[in-house]
C-alpha cells in the first residue's frame, strides 16, 4: 500500500503531513512554508493560482480571489450563515440549481467542493514533491460539528482532487491523536479548537492506545474570520468618521483592510498595541488619503466581546453531555491559530478552571493527527483504537411535523439503528420518510438530509405493513439508509432524493476538469523549467563566446551564434518541445567552445601545479607526512 497523507483542510490555512519512519512529518510547500493559505484565484490571463500565490495578488484581484470557502461547503444559499457571508465577501456567492451556495469568478460558477479540491490538489502536489512518488490515499479532517452534507461535500472535494479519501476524521479527534500517541497514563482531555472559520470542543478519554470521544459540540460559523471582520468594521467606521469616506464600497481597499486587520490581530497576541498604516488607501478631490491608526489589545477584546462569549456555551454543553465537571478534565489542549489570542486562552482558563496546555503546535497538530490515522489504516501504527461520535442526532419527521430521534448525538460511530414503520392509510402503495439531522424538536428547524420513498408496498389496511428502515452512520460520520419489508422479506427499493450536494455526473465532470488542470499545470511547470535551463545556457554560452571565441574556427563560431539566436527565439514561445530541441542543438554546437574553455583552465592551473609536483618528487616522504599532519591540525 502506498503512503497515506493526512490533510487538514482549513478555512484560512491548510496543512499536510505523512508518516515517515514511524513518526509524523509536516511537509513544507514549494514556498517553504508548513501551512498553505486556503485561497484560490483566477487571473486575467486565465491562470489558476492556489495558496500563497493567490494570497499575494488578492488586493489587486479581490473579485476573483476566493477564500474561506469551507464556510460555504455543504450549505444552502438561503441560509442565515450564507447571507452573512454574502454581505462581506468581495467575490460573488451565487445560488446553484440545486439550491447550494456556489461562487462565481471570471464569469464561471464553481461549487464549494470544486474550489476546496483545488486546495487539496495543491496539498497533494506538496506531498508528492516531498515523497517523490504519486499519492492517492488520504485522510482529510473536518470540524467535529460538521453535518452529513458538509462531510459528504468534503469527501466529494477529495474525489475531485484525485484522492481516495480513506477516512474523514474530526479535527479535535485528530489533535487528540497527535497529543496522546506517546502518553502512557489514562487521562480525560478537552480539545478546544478555534480555527479560521469553525469552533469545536471535544471531550475525550485516553488510555492504553484507546481514544474515546465522550462528547462533542461547537459552532461551524465562528472563527478567526469573524474576529477579523470586527477589526475591519472598526477601521472602516473610524476612517469614515475622520475622512467622511466609506471604504466598504471599494473592494480593493476592503481587501487591504482585511490583510491589515488580520496582521493587527496577530500582532496583538504578543504586544499591547499595534499601528495600522495603509498609505494611499483612497482619494477624493483634495488628493490621496492615508490611513493611520492605533489599535490596542483592550480595544480588540472589546470589539470581539460577544464572539468570546459564544465560546462558553458549547464547552458547558460538551461537559454536561460527557457527564463531567470542569475539575475532572485533566488537560485542555489548544488547537487552531485563534487560540494564540490571550483573551481566548483566558476564557478557556475561566471555563475549565485550569491553565490550558500549549504543548502542541496549533497550526500543525490536526494534520499530524490525520497522518497518524493514515498510519493506523495502513497498518504502520499499531495498538491505536479511535472511537469517535456523531455530533448531531439523526431522526425522521413524524405526525405533527415533530422530529423523532433514532440515533442520539454523541453516539459512538460506526453505528446502526433500525425502526419499524407502517402506513397511515388503507392500501397505501408508498411511504415517504423525511430524514433529519439536528437537535430541535420540530422537523422544520433541523437539517434535511433527504426524502426516502419506499415504493411497491402490497395493498393492506393501514398499520399492517411492517417496513423496517435502518439508519447507518459509517466511520466518516456519513449517513446511509436502507429498508426492508418484513412481511415479504424483500428488500424495498429506495429512491433517494438528495436535498443538496453534487450528483455523480457533476463530480465525474469536475474530476475530469481537475485532471485537465493538473496536466495543464504540469505543462506550465515544464515550460518554466525549460526556459530557466535555456536562459542559463544562453547566458553562459554568450559569456564564453566573448572570452574564447577566438580559440575556435569561424564556422563553429557562426554555428553557435545561429543556435543561440534560435534558442532566444524559442524562449519567446511556449512550445516546450521546440525549446528543448533548441537547447540540445546549442549544447551540441558548443562542444568545441567548451573544450577551449576547459583547455585554457587546465593550462592556467598546470604551471603552478607542475612546479608543486616537481617539488614534491624532489623531497622525501617525511615532508608529505608533515603536510598530512598539517591538514589534520587545520581540521581540529
From Swiss-Prot:
Keyword Lipid biosynthesis among UniProt keywords: no
Any one Gene Ontology molecular-function term assigned to this protein's record: ATP-dependent protein folding chaperone
Domain of life of the native organism: Bacteria
Keyword presence, ATP-binding: yes
Modified residues (Phosphothreonine): 198
Pfam families recorded: HSP70
Listed GO CC annotations: cytosol
Entries under InterPro entries matching the protein: ATPase_NBD, Chaperone_DnaK, Heat_shock_70_CS, HSP70_C_sf, HSP70_peptide-bd_sf, Hsp_70_fam
Biased composition (Acidic residues): 626-636
Entries under CDD domains matching the protein: ASKHA_NBD_HSP70_DnaK-like
HAMAP family: DnaK (MF_00332)
Family of this protein: Belongs to the heat shock protein 70 family.
PANTHER family: HEAT SHOCK PROTEIN 70KDA (PTHR19375)
Name listed for the protein in its UniProt record: Chaperone protein DnaK
